[in-house]
Amino acid sequence: MHWQEPAPAKAGGKARAPYEFGCKVSIATPATKPKGGQFVLHATALHGNPFDGHTLGPVVTELEQLTGIETRRIHVDKGYRGHNHKHKFRVWIAGQVRRVTQSIRREMKRRAAVEPVIGHLKAEHRLGRNYLKGRHGDRANAVLAAAGYNFALLLRWLRGLLRALLQTLFPPPLCAQYR
């Protein structure tokens, strides 16, 4: 006999899909623009429909443990108002006006760069639909999608490196330049 636990539904607020099923996934990327691409530093599934602001503290501590680097600034969207992060002066919410310098304003524009990363994770790396069972499956799917995305960036970089190496070792013949 096969029994599957029903997925909890959330009110999505969209006309085409009034209810959403599944869990929230938290994605963390660097605030600065890396040369190799926008890597995913941390991905985790959050169950029970938590408030965004309450998820910030645990996610940042996990991120600091994984990378070994203390985060200096965190740029989040307006859903994180009322967060419980211990260092409130390091969290910058979209649309914030007070204490915003020019460099922070420039970094806040980079916050929008995480949206295409989420889109690629959903469309090309199977984060949009999970085929794994249970809460552990949700967590594993989020981590595996992020790892696949990062691996694709590494493969793209290696492909460019190999192309440059082959062009250096085997230059095109002179007659090919004049065709």
Model regions and ranges:
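Polybasic low-complexity intrinsically disordered regions
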Residues: 1-72, 78, 85
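A glycine-rich phosphate-binding loop feature that marks nucleotide/adenosyl-phosphate handling sites
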Residues: 1-3, 76-83, 136, 164-172
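Composition- and surface-driven signal marking solvent-exposed, interaction-prone regions
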Residues: 41-45, 87-88, 132-135, 158-167
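Helix-centered, glycine/charged polyanion-binding patches within enzymatic domains
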Residues: 64, 68-140
